[in-house]
């Protein structure tokens, strides 16, 4: 075998390995989307809702996990249900919490 053919063969092997690796990345992405469809149910809207619920999440930075970060409460929280026209604001949840605490305090004072 000449040096040229050995070099060409080596180049072909490297190119094939790089294509196989990129195919594995796509395969993992497809598997994640398939799992999302199964998790959220095919009858409840199919691929579109799975994409909205599961899809294109941005990677979180280290400062997102700081105690003062607004994302800290969502770090280990359950996934929120899909709402067509938006989600309820944080103020609603705060109001519910405060009213519950006031009721408990009032009940303890009696």
UniProtKB/Swiss-Prot annotation:
Which residues in this protein are found as Phenylalanine amide?
40, 54, 85
Q: Which UniProt keywords apply?
A: Amidation, Cleavage on pair of basic residues, Neuropeptide, Secreted, Signal
Q: In which tissues is it expressed?
A: Each flp gene is expressed in a distinct set of neurons. Flp-11 is expressed in the DD, VD and DVB motor neurons, the PVC and URX interneurons, and the AUA, BAG, DA, LUA, and SAB neurons. Also expressed in head muscle, socket or sheath cells and uterine cells. Expressed exclusively in PHC sensory neurons in males. Expressed in AVK and RIS interneurons.
Signal sequence interval, chain numbering: 1-22
Q: Which domain of life is it from?
A: Eukaryota
* Predominant place of localization: secreted
Quick check: keyword Secreted in the entry? yes
Propeptide found at 23-29, 88-110
GO annotation, cellular component aspect: extracellular region
A GO molecular function term, named singly, is: neuropeptide receptor binding
One biological process term from GO is: neuropeptide signaling pathway
Cellular compartment(s):
Secreted
Q: Which residues carry this modification: Glutamine amide?
A: 72
According to the record, the residues making up region (Disordered) are: 60-85
Phenotype upon loss of function: Does not affect the body bend swimming frequency of animals. Exhibits normal pre-molting cessation of pumping. Larval locomotion quiescence reduced significantly and nose immobility reduced to 14% from 48% in wild-type animals. Photoactivation of apft-1 increases nose speed during quiescence in contrast to wild-type animals, which significantly reduce mobility. Shows higher RIS activation at the onset of sleep. Shows diminished RIS-induced body elongation, briefer slowing response and transient stop at the onset of RIS activation. Reverses more immediately after RIS stimulus onset.
Q: What job does this protein perform?
A: FMRFamides and FMRFamide-like peptides are neuropeptides. Induces sleep-like quiescence behavior following release from RIS interneuron. Helps to sustain locomotion stop after gamma-aminobutyric acid (GABA) induces fast slowing response. Inhibits the late-stage body bend swimming frequency in animals through several receptors including frpr-3, npr-4 and npr-22.
Family the entry assigns: Belongs to the FARP (FMRFamide related peptide) family.
Descriptive protein name: FMRFamide-like neuropeptides 11
What organism does this protein naturally occur in? Caenorhabditis elegans
């Amino acid at each position: 075998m000449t040096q040229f053919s050995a070099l060409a063969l080596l180049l072909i092997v490297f190119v094939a390995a790089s294509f196989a690796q990129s195919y594995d990345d796509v395969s993992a992405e497809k598997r994640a989307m398939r799992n999302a469809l199964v998790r959220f149910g095919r009858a409840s809207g199919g691929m579109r809702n799975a994409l909205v619920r599961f899809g294109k999440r941005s990677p979180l930075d280290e400062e997102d996990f700081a105690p003062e970060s607004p994302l800290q409460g969502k770090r280990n929280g359950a996934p929120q249900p899909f709402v067509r026209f938006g989600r309820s604001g944080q103020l609603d949840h705060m109001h519910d919490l405060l009213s519950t605490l006031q009721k408990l305090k009032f009940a303890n004072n009696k």
